């Protein structure tokens, strides 16, 4: 009985950790507003002055201004943490809008950096009355009331993706999914990585760790005759495949009754709703691609469909009613009429497709310029 409870506990924990399946309008498996941290700790009247100074230094100069993404990236770089740890922290807190932190999310980011620096897990917050203070070097980056720093930001604090210089730690996916796209490193490197305190902190933040057995599929070699649109479809299908395969690794050894129980919880229901959105995006892409879909992408799509049929009873298949759907433009990714449009770089994207792309493929949306 103890083993069964342990398995159930692991599944629930992994469902919570894997809540970063990018879908529009979903707050994920986390608390509203700031993501991983209790909302009470993120109240601006309670956060340490250090947090408010850091917010001002990052572009949040008024009571409603959001932090400047480019400045936040620079601030993260002063923490001394490895780039993959910073990437995971960003993915954990960036919930509301890809590439732009809200003010509570910014506070969450600072708190997770502090925990990672100390090698502590999220559980440590239970014993804290206020948010931990991270070490950021140089501290001169934060202006004080007596010596305010000049600002050159004359417009909005939001920096569009296209104006942000590429950063090696900008998250393109959760770390477990990112690892599925990489080759296995040598044993010596793996031992070194596991012995690193910073890596241990990242593992604490990540929750359960998948084994390397789910990384057996190699990334398909790009066809030299592939058009930009076909490449976009291939990348999108593969990103969905990775999301679905991660879910399969989570549930494949679980009994149907256990999965059913999870699907009836608030967090489990949101998880399966997110999977359902990923499946819907897959069908939109396949409908546009038709016979132009590559052989490998076709295999991945069929694999996903088989699992969708297997999990159909756990997912709410009721179509969402969108009374505001009056836009007849097509999404630059799936090439189907947009349901929740977002404009970027002179193109129109469906929000679900855009979030999937930013979290699973690249931090920059594709430039296809559909007519």
From Swiss-Prot:
It comes from the Eukaryota. Gene3D superfamilies: EF-hand (1.10.238.10). Residues 179-205 are annotated as: Disordered. Residues 43-148 form the EH domain. This is Uncharacterized protein R10E11.6. It comes from Caenorhabditis elegans.
């Amino acid at each position: 009985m103890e083993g069964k409870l342990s398995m159930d506990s692991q599944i629930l924990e992994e469902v919570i950790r894997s809540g970063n399946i990018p879908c529009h309008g979903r707050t994920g498996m986390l608390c509203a507003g700031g993501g991983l941290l209790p909302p009470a700790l993120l109240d601006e009247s309670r956060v340490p002055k250090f947090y408010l100074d850091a917010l001002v230094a990052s572009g949040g100069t008024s009571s409603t201004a959001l932090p400047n993404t480019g400045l936040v990236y620079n601030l993260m770089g002063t923490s001394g943490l490895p780039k993959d740890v910073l990437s995971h922290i960003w993915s954990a807190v960036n919930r509301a809008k890809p590439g732009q932190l809200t003010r509570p999310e910014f506070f969450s980011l600072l708190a997770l950096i502090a925990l990672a620096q100390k090698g502590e897990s999220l559980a440590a917050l239970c014993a804290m009355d206020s948010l931990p203070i991270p070490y950021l070097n140089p501290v001169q980056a934060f202006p004080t009331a007596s010596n305010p720093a000049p600002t050159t930001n004359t417009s909005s604090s939001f920096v569009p993706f296209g104006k942000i210089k590429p950063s090696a730690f900008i998250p393109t996916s959760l770390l477990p999914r990112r690892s599925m796209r990489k080759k296995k490193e040598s044993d010596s490197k793996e031992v070194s990585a596991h012995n690193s305190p910073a890596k241990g902190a990242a593992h604490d933040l990540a929750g359960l760790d998948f084994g390397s057995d789910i990384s057996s599929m190699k990334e398909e070699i790009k066809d030299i005759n592939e058009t930009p649109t076909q490449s976009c479809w291939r990348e999108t299908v593969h990103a969905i495949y990775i999301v679905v395969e991660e879910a399969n690794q989570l549930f494949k050894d679980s009994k149907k009754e256990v999965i059913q129980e999870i699907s009836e919880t608030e967090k489990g229901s949101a998880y399966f709703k997110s999977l359902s959105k990923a499946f819907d995006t897959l069908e939109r892409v396949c409908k546009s691609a038709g016979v132009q879909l590559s052989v490998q992408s076709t295999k991945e799509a069929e694999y996903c469909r088989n699992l969708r049929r297997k999990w159909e009873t756990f997912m709410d298949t009721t179509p969402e009613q969108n009374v505001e759907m009056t836009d007849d433009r097509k999404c630059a990714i799936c090439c189907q009429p947009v349901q929740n449009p977002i404009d970027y770089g002179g193109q129109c994207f469906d929000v679900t497709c855009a979030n999937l792309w930013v979290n699973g493929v690249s931090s920059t949306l594709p430039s296809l310029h559909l007519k």
